[in-house]
Amino acid sequence: LWLKERATPCPDAKHAGIAESLRGAWTTLKSLPQFPDFGILTTCGFLYQCGVAVVITLSAVYAAAVMGFTTEDTILMVFLVNITAAAGAFGFGYAQDRLGHKRALMVTLVVWLAMIVVAYFSETRTHFWIAANLAGLAMGSSQSAGRAMVGVFAPEGRQAEFYGLWNLALWLSAVVGPLSYGMITWVTGNDHRLAICATGLFFLLAIVVLVPLNVERGAARAKEMSAREAA
């Protein structure tokens, strides 16, 4: 309470930080052809995070509109999914060490796709509970696997740039995913089942995009560029 702040206020610091972040992201974006595997990963991350954003922001809406969940049901679902997400992140951490980054991410994307299928065909609350817990299992692990590979593909001294572009892609996905869901329900007259089915396309496309990614090649490219920039 008695500590005095001696720093001089800088009103433009926030705007300068945003501008600097955007410039860094643009610089990294222009250099993507030199890092093809990072480009693949960023595209994949954008796609699957579009789907994840839909699940995070609109799962309660789907549960109420399609499955007839009450507010109490939704609160319980969120609570249990958080527990499942913690267990999934812990378990997939070990799986990632054994399978490698790419395979671990591929497994989580398949789980996400399975969740969409179960949610789409759910006719009872039990089926939807299964879908919700599948989402929990995949949620933390898919995000951690992607971020781990960003660190592998980033040259020494440029980690902030690469993570900046990765975070920008995730920010865009948080807008595009829910917006696409909303547009589909609007066009189809509140057909939430069709909207959740369409959300599965994000995960399916992410799997297709991920297939040609080569972690070893991307890591070697990062080391090569680090050595070149240090010379």
Show where each model-derived region lies.
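Multi-pass alpha-helical transporter architecture, strongest
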Residues: 1-3, 197-231
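Juxtamembrane intracellular "pre-TM" segments in multi-pass secondary transporters
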Residues: 5-42, 228-231
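Short amphipathic helix-loop junctions that connect adjacent transmembrane helices
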Residues: 57-74
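Helix-to-loop junctions at the C-terminal end of transmembrane segments
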Residues: 87-101, 185
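Structural signature of the two symmetry-related core transmembrane helices
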Residues: 103-118
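Intracellular juxtamembrane helix-capping segments at the cytosolic ends
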Residues: 141-155
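A membrane-interface helix-boundary motif in multi-pass transporters
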Residues: 183-203
